From Swiss-Prot:
Entry-linked Pfam families: DUF1292
S-S bonds: none
Classification via HAMAP family: UPF0473
Similarity-based family: Belongs to the UPF0473 family.
Protein name: UPF0473 protein LGAS_0424
Organism: Lactobacillus gasseri (strain ATCC 33323 / DSM 20243 / BCRC 14619 / CIP 102991 / JCM 1131 / KCTC 3163 / NCIMB 11718 / NCTC 13722 / AM63)
Length: 104
């Protein structure tokens, strides 16, 4: 299991998150993007254990990468601003509706 995201390489596509009860869960990275309006980078994740038949709950976080582009779970930040959430949701909707981006 990897605890790092490398935003510059496609082969590091997983991160382990720990919930409030100390339970670890492995997540796959759906995609990352940067918003010039908010001056932040974002990562969208989904549980690695999801099968193709399951509905997927996507989680989004802003993040701070180090100078090598690496990110650990402690570098993820919850999105609390409604306008920021709406922007992230819009990017996700565009991704999901564009077959060229989502790989379908």
């Amino acid at each position: 299991m990897s605890e790092k995201i490398n935003a510059n390489q496609d082969n590091d596509r997983q991160i382990t998150l720990v919930d409030d009860q100390g339970n670890e869960e492995l997540f796959e990275i759906l995609f990352t993007f940067t918003s010039e309006d908010y001056g932040k980078s974002y990562v969208l994740l989904y549980p690695a254990a999801v099968s193709d038949d399951d509905d997927v709950e996507v989680q989004a976080f802003s993040y701070d990468a180090d100078e090598d582009g690496d990110v650990t779970s402690s570098d993820l930040h919850e999105i609390s601003d409604d306008d920021e959430w709406n922007m992230v949701q819009g990017v996700l909707n565009t991704f999901l509706s564009d077959d060229r981006l989502s790989g379908e």
